[in-house]
Amino acid sequence: MFTGSIVAIVTPMDEKGNVCRASLKKLIDYHVASGTSAIVSVGTTGESATLNHDEHADVVMMTLELADGRIPVIAGTGANATAEAISLTQRFNDSGIVGCLTVTPYYNRPSQEGLYQHFKAIAEHTDLPQILYNVPSRTGCDLLPETVGRLAKVKNIIGIKEATGNLTRVNQIKELVSDDFVLLSGDDASALDFMQLGGHGVISVTANVAARDMAQMCKLAAEGHFAEARVINQRLMPLHNKLFVEPNPIPVKWACKELGLVATDTLRLPMTPITDSGRETVRAALKHAGLL
């Protein structure tokens, strides 16, 4: 369940900015039918930054309910205060989620020792499997391989989403962790190369709109059929890149609407609607991928 194509799912909203249950069900059904390995609910792409904690928990629980055991659900539970992250994580004890994706603290930029103590404290307050999430371009701090190696010794820290796009990290981390520690890419554009170096899969934005292709690409890569996987990846490459032509999740939410997967592309401020130029750029990438 922690391998292959795991979607960082968008949080669909109605025109008033309320979570749209019907669209969420449609998305989940789409991922079940497409072979997506698991769903990350309320991560960065799911607009965790603009949901309060009650809404955050409600969306995760709604996702679990609608998934109905058909696909594993992982909850995004990070915060930049350790006590807050512990509290949010503990909301999902015994809920049915299979694990938590926990981002490094953002804005306050802790030291490596601070990062170690932060993640260790969270893990010690829950039995839920913990996946570390390193995305320094967003958080302002970088979880270094040596710290990952230390954290991998904590019993329920089972993997990392490594979203630097720096492929040297794969081998650096592999040298410091056990073979069963899960290495997931957080960068669609380099995910196939990441897997070829020994990674286990990707937590994907692209999978929101190209779920079947991403699942197939990861399956081929896991089986060692990298030439075939690369054919799919080359077709998706403009999409990997152009889904970030404007801040995530603006482009991917619009793309979901364009493909009829959600009813609206409504976002909450400070996220704003996609621009005309962004729309045309993403539409061209969808066509290149064979999705339009």
Swiss-Prot record:
Keyword S-adenosyl-L-methionine: no
Function as written in the Swiss-Prot or TrEMBL entry: Catalyzes the condensation of (S)-aspartate-beta-semialdehyde [(S)-ASA] and pyruvate to 4-hydroxy-tetrahydrodipicolinate (HTPA).
Alphabetized NCBIfam families for the sequence: dapA
Enzyme class: lyase
Subunit structure: Homotetramer; dimer of dimers.
Family statement drawn from the similarity comment of this UniProt entry: Belongs to the DapA family.
Pathway: Amino-acid biosynthesis; L-lysine biosynthesis via DAP pathway; (S)-tetrahydrodipicolinate from L-aspartate: step 3/4
EC numbers on record: 4.3.3.7
Protein known as: 4-hydroxy-tetrahydrodipicolinate synthase
Subcellular location: Cytoplasm
PANTHER family named in the record: 4-HYDROXY-2-OXOGLUTARATE ALDOLASE, MITOCHONDRIAL, DIHYDRODIPICOLINATE SYNTHASE
Catalytic center residues: 133 (proton donor/acceptor), 161 (schiff-base intermediate with substrate)
SUPFAM superfamilies in the cross-refs: Aldolase
GO molecular function: 4-hydroxy-tetrahydrodipicolinate synthase activity
Amino-acid positions noted as binding pyruvate in the UniProt annotation, renumbered to this chain: 45, 203
Organism field: Escherichia coli O139:H28 (strain E24377A / ETEC)
InterPro entries membership: Aldolase_TIM, DapA, DapA-like, Schiff_base-form_aldolases_AS, Schiff_base-form_aldolases_CS
Pfam families assigned: DHDPS
